[in-house]
């Protein structure tokens, strides 16, 4: 018995468990960003199309989002460490399949499905393991460290993807992830074992199935927008039906005294609803814009993956800077003010970017807009959790954290899906303008098909099939410029909605004791310090 207690004490003293779960957080976050810059090479290597790659990228985050709530419950039933290691195993198998992919189907199975499932199982357990391993003083540092590692992964993801794709192969990205998983397994004995906190009978399987179907149909509906509007509407309607079934079932389960997947009573908290919506919008804007800009740079400018990654650094770097400064700024200013400033900066960035895209665009042209977009959304994302869970009890905070992570991950999937569709729809609309200007007497249908094929393959076609080089360049310029304008218009409107939502936040819930204490010390600092010194002397 003493030996077991000593082992657990040693694990609490060691930072190795933190390093292991932080590594998992690193590769999961890296996975969501590094493949965007490899789109052109994926199309070439796997003999596929932009639409297929678009679907694969969207489904990776969708798989993670749809299973996040279920994974949060499973860790209480099976055990935090067990569910974390199971997720790592599935993730590692997915990385092997993705690295060896010979076609888009293999990549979909390995990356979108298996790595998505593995990431969903590991993500909730990462925070739970940290909270269960370290005491209050060390826990604050551990949580901040894991969060910072995730931020670094998001910032370097495009550059990492660009480097391995250009100088090695995108397959090495998955090989790197596999190496990290092997390290986690090699040192897994250092992670503390946690006893299950719930019985298997408490698992809400039906609610989990309803939630998965709802989210999958929602994203499929978005992806179908560019192909079949009627089918898209049908999918949206069915998704709403399943959402209603999910809500009704969860409320019925709660009324019967059973434990639901989600306690619907938690949504009475206005700040939680606002926080979920705000983070959802922020992730749509961020991941959607990264995808659209990557497509433009590789499709119109013929940038390789490394150059594409370099051009995305201002945005991802801005997110990292905001993440590092947000907590310090929140001691001085209210969350509502900071998040409003974040949305305003992001809107300015989107408006600037609207006028920058063309065949002669350079890094210096898009860097200011990308940086403003990144630093603004970084503030919003970093403060969104604190806004949502402030004042909740511990049990409610756990449920709320799962909902917030789900909304953020779903936002990533919807962002890639929606803005990818807008990019393609915008490009299609631009073809008519281009043909009218440069070849008014030509068969428009012929050039719509030709330009559409060109975009789907990101230029990996026989150039003679689409007009002369000069006319093709001019048409491509108009097509993609119009498409990027539409993307940035949509992004600005979306961010404006987010800005409006920040004004629904109850600021009283997020101004904590620390802010009030700082304000008091600013007004009475010298006197307060002297009084404390005098009191100390009197006691002596």
Model-based region annotation:
Residues 45-47, 79, 100-106, 168-169, ...:
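Helix-breaking motifs and short loop linkers at transmembrane-helix boundaries and internal kinks
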Residues 166-278, 285, 303, 311:
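Hydrophobic transmembrane-helix bundles of small-molecule transporters
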Residues 14-27, 35-37, 50, 228, ...:
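12-transmembrane solute porter fold
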Residues 409-503, 512-529:
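Hydrophobic transmembrane architecture of multi-pass small-molecule transporters
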Residues 68-206, 224:
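Helix-loop-helix hairpins in multi-pass membrane proteins, especially solute transporters
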Residues 1-30, 44:
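Cytosolic juxtamembrane N-terminal segment immediately preceding the first transmembrane helix
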Residues 38-66, 106-108:
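Extracellular/periplasmic helix-loop-helix junction of adjacent transmembrane segments
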Residues 58-72, 123-127, 313-325:
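Central cavity-lining transmembrane alpha-helices of secondary-active solute carriers
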């Amino acid at each position: 018995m003493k030996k077991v207690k000593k082992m657990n004490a040693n694990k609490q003293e060691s930072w190795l468990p933190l390093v292991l779960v932080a590594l998992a957080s690193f590769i999961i976050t890296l996975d969501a960003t590094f493949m965007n810059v490899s789109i052109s090479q994926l199309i070439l290597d796997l003999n596929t199309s932009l639409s297929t790659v678009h679907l694969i990228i969207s489904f990776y985050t969708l798989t993670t989002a749809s299973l996040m709530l279920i994974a949060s419950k499973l860790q209480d039933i099976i055990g935090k460490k067990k569910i974390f290691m199971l997720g790592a195993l599935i993730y590692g198998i997915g990385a092997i399949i993705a690295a060896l992919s010979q076609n888009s189907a293999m990549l979909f199975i390995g990356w979108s499905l298996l790595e998505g499932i593995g990431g969903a199982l590991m993500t909730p357990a990462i925070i739970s393991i940290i909270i269960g391993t370290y005491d209050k003083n060390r826990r604050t540092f551990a949580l901040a460290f894991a969060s910072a590692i995730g931020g670094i992964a998001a910032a370097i993801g495009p550059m990492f993807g660009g480097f391995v794709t250009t100088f090695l192969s995108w397959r090495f990205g998955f090989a790197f992830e596999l190496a990290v998983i092997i390290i986690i397994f090699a040192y897994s004995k250092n992670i503390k074992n946690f006893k299950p906190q719930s019985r298997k009978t408490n698992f809400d399987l039906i609610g989990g199935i309803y939630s998965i179907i709802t989210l999958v149909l929602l994203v499929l509906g978005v992806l179908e927008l560019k192909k079949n509007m009627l089918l898209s509407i049908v999918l949206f309607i069915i998704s709403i039906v399943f959402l209603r079934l999910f809500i009704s079932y969860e409320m019925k389960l709660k009324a019967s005294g059973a434990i639901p997947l989600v306690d619907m009573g938690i949504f009475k908290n206005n700040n939680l609803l606002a926080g979920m919506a705000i983070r959802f919008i922020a992730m749509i804007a961020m991941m959607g814009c990264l995808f659209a800009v990557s497509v433009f740079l590789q499709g119109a400018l013929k940038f390789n993956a490394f150059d594409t990654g370099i051009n995305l650094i201002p945005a991802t770097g801005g997110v990292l800077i905001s993440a590092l400064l947000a907590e310090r700024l929140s001691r001085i200013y209210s969350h509502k003010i900071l998040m409003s400033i974040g949305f305003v900066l992001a809107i300015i960035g989107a408006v600037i970017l609207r006028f920058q895209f063309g065949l002669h665009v350079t890094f210096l042209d898009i860097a200011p807009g990308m940086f403003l977009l990144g630093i603004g959304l970084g503030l919003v994302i970093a403060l969104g959790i604190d806004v949502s869970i402030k004042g909740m009890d511990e049990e409610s905070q756990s449920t709320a954290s799962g909902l917030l992570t789900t909304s953020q991950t779903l936002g990533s999937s919807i962002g890639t899906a929606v803005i990818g569709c807008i990019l393609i729809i915008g490009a299609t609309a631009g073809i008519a303008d281009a043909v009218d200007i440069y070849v008014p007497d030509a068969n428009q249908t012929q050039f719509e098909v030709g330009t559409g094929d060109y975009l789907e393959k990101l230029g990996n076609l026989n150039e003679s099939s689409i007009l002369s080089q000069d006319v093709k360049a001019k048409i491509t310029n108009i097509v993609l410029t119009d498409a990027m304008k539409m993307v940035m218009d949509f992004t600005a409107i979306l961010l404006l909605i987010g800005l409006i939502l920040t004004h629904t936040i109850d600021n009283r819930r997020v101004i904590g004791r620390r802010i009030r204490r700082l304000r008091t010390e600013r007004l009475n600092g010298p006197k307060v310090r002297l009084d404390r010194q005098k009191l100390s002397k009197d006691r002596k």
